[in-house]
Amino acid sequence: MESSTAFYDYHDKLSLLCENNVIFFSTISTIVLYSLVFLLSLVGNSLVLWVLVKYENLESLTNIFILNLCLSDLMFSCLLPVLISAQWSWFLGDFFCKFFNMIFGISLYSSIFFLTIMTIHRYLSVVSPISTLGIHTLRCRVLVTSCVWAASILFSIPDAVFHKVISLNCKYSEHHGFLASVYQHNIFFLLSMGIILFCYVQILRTLFRTRSRQRHRTVRLIFTVVVAYFLSWAPYNLTLFLKTGIIQQSCESLQQLDIAMIICRHLAFSHCCFNPVLYVFVGIKFRRHLKHLFQQVWLCRKTSSTVPCSPGTFTYEGPSFY
């Protein structure tokens, strides 16, 4: 049987009979990996937020999306310590069981929402720049972000409704609730990826006819972030679908699926620390801002405490920190 903290596992009668030897692997790997991911995500995403607020133009819609994507990753990473502490049993009661899974759903849906909207925005900016002239107002920024978070809360309600504490485990109380949640996640994931794929096909067709290096840089980073998200979450969504029991499985195949589920879940849940790394390696402006920030901090440490020292602001250079 898998760890009690697997969010979307439903142990039917067959899987209950098929006891396996992956509990030790699951527990140890979860504790070690999630502790590391939590620290990396906390540091990395906090640095991204600092760079955005300190050095960048928050009137840019793209930067607002990046900021909210950071908040979503931080929200997810804050769930990991609870996940670690609840490896053997759920100790926080029904309310926090529901709340915990709802926050998980909100961070999951908000991430894919913001990635999809970022791609659509970049598609419009490249393919039809005139159509984006009126969407950079404060009212538009507030409206878009509010709608995304509201929709994320709405989509995550089933995760809260169908979860409860059963035998000291926080899990789905009804099999149909598990099925509905998995189908919703997978359909939403596939639709979003379909929209993103369409947008990038059109973007690439347009960019082949233009030589704007700024546009190429921006598209390249957003594309890298989207690909990283897809590669992280697609295997997890696939194993979730297989766990629904749609495909008839033997005891041996269930054991193999349990191991695959652990590995895919670890990969998916580690995604919250990936984006800051991608920004460093792909985002030229972000890398320059980060270097400037570290130089300022280093100079402040070397300066006498009697001399006031505060990091300055970077000169605004463009619509986003790519």
Swiss-Prot record:
Membrane topology, from the record: Multi-pass membrane protein
Function according to Swiss-Prot or TrEMBL: Receptor for chemokines SCYC1 and SCYC2. Subsequently transduces a signal by increasing the intracellular calcium ions level. Receptor for XCL1/Lymphotactin.
Top-level taxon of origin: Eukaryota
Protein name, as recorded: Chemokine XC receptor 1
Cystine crosslinks: 97-170
Residues that span the membrane, as ranges: 28-55, 66-85, 99-120, 138-162, 186-204, 221-243, 260-283
Cytoplasmic side: 56-65, 121-137, 205-220, 284-322
Annotated organism of origin: Mus musculus (Mouse)
InterPro entries linked: CCR1-9-like, Chemokine_XCR1, GPCR_Rhodpsn, GPCR_Rhodpsn_7TM
Segments on the Extracellular face: 1-27, 86-98, 163-185, 244-259
PANTHER family to which the protein is assigned, alphabetical: CELL ADHESION MOLECULE (PTHR10489), CHEMOKINE XC RECEPTOR 1 (PTHR10489:SF730)
Keyword Cell cycle: no
Protein keywords: Cell membrane, Disulfide bond, G-protein coupled receptor, Membrane, Receptor, Transducer, Transmembrane, Transmembrane helix
Pfam families in the record: 7tm_1
Distribution of this protein across tissues and organs: Expressed by dendritic cells from the thymus, slpeen, subcutaneous lymph nodes and mesenteric lymph nodes.
